[in-house]
Amino acid sequence: MIFLMTKDSFLLQGFWQLKDNHEMIKINSLSEIKKVGNKPFKVIIDTYHNHILDEEAIKFLEKLDAERIIVLAPYHISKLKAKAPIYFVSRKESIKNLLEITYGKHLPHKNSQLCFSHNQFKIMQLILKNKNESNITSTLNISQQTLKIQKFNIMYKLKLRRMSDIVTLGITSYF
């Protein structure tokens, strides 16, 4: 059984046509995932315009007893603070490869996607929500200096000159 969370109708149709004999259920929120007996299940989450990955979502995904949780995104979060089997896969991957990965194909260790730490990911989310520096430091319980260093690292990874340029990137619709 596969739970699929996406707003992309083309992606949904591709999965429906290639699903083989596996049962596939489209969901609109993580709370719709219900464990069905002892059946193993997988979860696919498309982050494009979903704004789904936050602390509550990560905690919810940890509690699930899913075989695999695949997140379709143009980035991956290194050292994600979760015990769940979460895999970040590029959204540009072919539907056929996505299904093979979903069914258990081994993922290569080398990942050419952008790689953010868990804190960098949370900082980017808060910046995109127009939070100021004091709100960010208090929310994440980090110092001003740590925030400055993390912002510099984010700007370096995204090749930005100013942090305000982050809103012009195509990647922001995934946060």
Curated annotation (Swiss-Prot):
Note one Pfam family from the annotation. Answer: GerE
Q: What are its GO biological-process terms?
A: cellular stress response to acidic pH; regulation of DNA-templated transcription
Q: Which residues bind DNA?
A: 133-152
Query: What is any one of the record's Gene Ontology cellular component terms?
Result: transcription regulator complex
Q: What induces it?
A: By acidic conditions. Could be induced by EvgA via the induction of YdeO. By heat shock (shift from 30 to 45 degrees Celsius) (at protein level).
Start and end residues of each HTH luxR-type domain: 109-174
- Molecular functions (GO terms): DNA binding
Q: Which InterPro entries match?
A: Sig_transdc_resp-reg_C-effctor, Tscrpt_reg_LuxR_C, WH-like_DNA-bd_sf
- Keywords in alphabetical order, please: Activator, DNA-binding, Stress response, Transcription, Transcription regulation
Q: What exactly does this protein do?
A: Regulates the expression of several genes involved in acid resistance. Required for the expression of gadA and gadBC, among others, regardless of media or growth conditions. Binds directly to the 20 bp GAD box found in the control regions of both loci.
Quote the protein name from its UniProt record: Transcriptional regulator GadE
